[in-house]
Amino acid sequence: MRAQLLFLIVFFNSFLAHNQIILNKIESIKTNDSYELISADSLGELFFLEDNNLRKGEDYFFSDSSLGPITKVDFYNNFKLKVWYQDFNTLVILDNYLNEITRVQFNKASSVFEISDISSANENDIWVYDESNMRIKKFDFFNQVFTENVHTLIDGNLIDMKSNYNYLWVLTDKYLYKINYNGLIIFKKENKIGSKKIGFYKNDILLSNESELYHLENN
């Protein structure tokens, strides 16, 4: 345990030594035990989950109890937030004020899709993982069609996937993948450390397991 703690201290001290970190006090927001802070945008706006409602500060919220619990919220583009409800295979796109722009109900598609995760692609596209055939696909949520010839097969059970627009990073229990805009795998590395989560720091990748944090340079 002491060795793991030392690793984290050295890791973060290395970041602090090369990057000026400034902490600013934010305005107080009234919360209770049911609030879960899930994100903060570049303007300092805070996003919470409260009793399965998505809230932005104290003024804006989105809720649709008919879709069950919120599985994931993708904040990469704050003007097109993606709210994923896996139980009902439904994606809801929200604007900056949490008003609904559109929604996708994959259960109503002509083919059978078992979407278990989503991540932003570009302006009107998202990446989805279809468990029915273990493939990464790209979907145009405005025209509600899949992009032809983008169906990337991955090996292992999906753990996490995140995009920084330029690339999609996919983590399974076997491998870490880096996938380009066209769905081509350009990087594949064994998941030997048992990573459970992908994060971004500037242009680099952070990987974490249950006790350690790793820094992967994105060259």
Range-by-range predicted roles:
Residues 1-26:
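Bacterial Sec-dependent N-terminal signal peptides
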Residues 26-51:
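Beta-strand-rich domains and repeat architectures in extracellular enzymes and scaffolds
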Residues 27-32, 61-66, 105-111, 149-154, ...:
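Surface loop/turn motifs at the tips and blade-to-blade linkers of beta-strand repeat domains
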Residues 33-39, 67-74, 112-119, 155-165, ...:
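Repeated scaffold domains used in trafficking and secretory/extracellular systems
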Residues 43-44, 78-79, 123-124, 165-166, ...:
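Short coil/turn segments that connect the beta-strands within blades of beta-propeller domains
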Residues 51, 86, 123, 131, ...:
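Short loop/turn segments immediately following the C-termini of beta-strands
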Residues 55, 92, 135-137, 177-178, ...:
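WD40 beta-propeller blade core
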Residues 58, 95-99, 140-143, 180-184, ...:
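Short loop/turn segments that connect beta-strands within beta-propeller blades
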